[in-house]
A protein has these predicted regions:
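Feature detects amphipathic, helix-rich regulatory segments
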Residues: 1, 31, 35, 74, ...
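Extended, structured, electrostatic nucleic-acid-contact surfaces
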Residues: 1-9, 15-16, 47-63
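Catalytic DNA-binding helix-loop module of base-excision-repair DNA glycosylases/AP lyases
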Residues: 13-21, 36
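C-terminal structural segments of small proteins and small subunits
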Residues: 53-83
């Protein structure tokens, strides 16, 4: 099992938030996906914002969050707006 902090975009603070909501490994994050992970974080940390969702998706895709495609960003923004 791989430590979350080894993933792109995942620093100590984000790793701690993920662990606090039961997502303790890279494999678990990939398995549940960025949207479900963000939803869990948002419930525990209401001030979580769209950039947090972008960083999670970037981590899963193994790219910097600012390199996400416009289509993915639109999809993630729509999800964020719906919760």
């Amino acid at each position: 099992m791989t430590n979350l902090i080894t993933m792109k975009n995942i620093g100590k603070e984000m790793a701690n938030k993920l662990i606090s909501v039961g997502i303790e490994t890279k494999e678990k994050l990939i398995q549940i996906g960025s949207k479900e992970a963000f939803h869990k974080i948002k419930e525990a940390y209401p001030n979580a914002c769209l950039v947090h969702l972008y960083t999670l998706e970037g981590a899963i895709q193994d790219i910097e969050f600012n390199q996400l495609s416009d289509n993915i960003k639109k999809e993630l923004k729509a999800f964020n707006d719906s919760i």
